[in-house]
Amino acid sequence: WASQVSENRPVCKAIIQGKQFEGLVDTGADVSIIALNQWPKNWPKQKAVTGLVGIGTASEVYQSTEILHCLGPDNQESTVQPMITSIPLNLWGRDLLQQWGAEITMPAPLYSPTSQKIMTKMGYIPGKGLGKNEDGIKVPVEAKINQEREGIGYPF
């Protein structure tokens, strides 16, 4: 599973005890939280001994009485003992994200800052193609080595 940062929220599916849930990937949350209206009535829960901070005022906060088996978005095996409260959507916190091997990466730019400034001064608009109608290639051309002409002074 991969998601680019955009105006859309990063949501993914997980299967907990055989039941599918969709939740928001939340790297700022220490623990995963299931919305009270999605928690199956026959699954045991207890009043939580600790409160939740950062999600507004939650009057009823519960926690699963059991540690539950979970499959991540790419079938990663994990366990979770989620909190349960009245929130509009489920949150996948770092307790699950770490077990799933989640990582945040920021790729290095393809071009140096100097070359980017030169291209911008020449009228290049990032994401658009080169040329009069901005419909040319949008990705760098990959250099390919010609094995027959490799090195200095190749044979004639």
Curated annotation (Swiss-Prot):
The keyword Cell membrane does not apply. Autoproteolytically processed at the N-terminus. Expected C-terminal autoprocessing not detected. The sequence shown is that of the processed Pro protein. Keywords: Aspartyl protease, Autocatalytic cleavage, ERV, Hydrolase, Protease, Transposable element. It comes from the Eukaryota. InterPro entries: Aspartic_peptidase_AS, G_patch_dom, HERV-K_Pro_peptidase_A2, Peptidase_A2_cat, Peptidase_aspartic_dom_sf, Retropepsin-like_cat_dom, Retropepsins. It catalyses: Processing at the authentic HIV-1 PR recognition site and release of the mature p17 matrix and the p24 capsid protein, as a result of the cleavage of the -SQNY-|-PIVQ- cleavage site. One of its GO terms (biological process) is viral translational frameshifting. Retroviral proteases have roles in processing of the primary translation products and the maturation of the viral particle. Endogenous Pro proteins may have kept, lost or modified their original function during evolution. This endogenous protein has retained most of the characteristics of retroviral proteases. One of its GO terms (molecular function) is aspartic-type endopeptidase activity. Its EC number is 3.4.23.50. This is Endogenous retrovirus group K member 7 Pro protein. Residues 21-96 form the Peptidase A2 domain. Residues 111-156 form the G-patch domain. Pfam families: G-patch, RVP. Active as a homodimer. The active site is at D26. The gene is ERVK-7.
